[in-house]
Amino acid sequence: MSTLKVNTVQHNTSGFNNVVQFTDGAGTENGTLCRAWVNFNGTGTVAIRADFNVSSITDIALGQYTVNFSNALSDANYAAVVTSYYTNATNQNGYISYEDSRLKARTSSSFTLATSTTSVYNDSAIISVIIHR
């Protein structure tokens, strides 16, 4: 086993959409780095706490948000992981939706999600989104 210690990793300009890819000795892709992530407050005035490749969050309506990417992905065929924290005195359970027919379809430059309890959209204090492609 070897240890790789570097300060900078650069993409190969001939690579797919300028993405850093990890490959084995035969050149088979084993993975890529996270393309975008964000942690934001979805209550009151929406505010980004920390992010990578996210330019802004649009507060569409109660419990509905659009994450806008700083640099668009090559297409909308990415995987999204979303978590949220919602609590009130009567309902501790919530769910997250991002493939809801009531929401705007994902694009290469944005991703819309909703947080809710039962069938009602609710704002969440902590929402995290991770995008892989």
Language model segments and positions:
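Extracellular receptor-binding modules and their adjoining Ser/Thr/Gly/Asp/Asn-rich linkers
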Residues: 2-75, 116-133
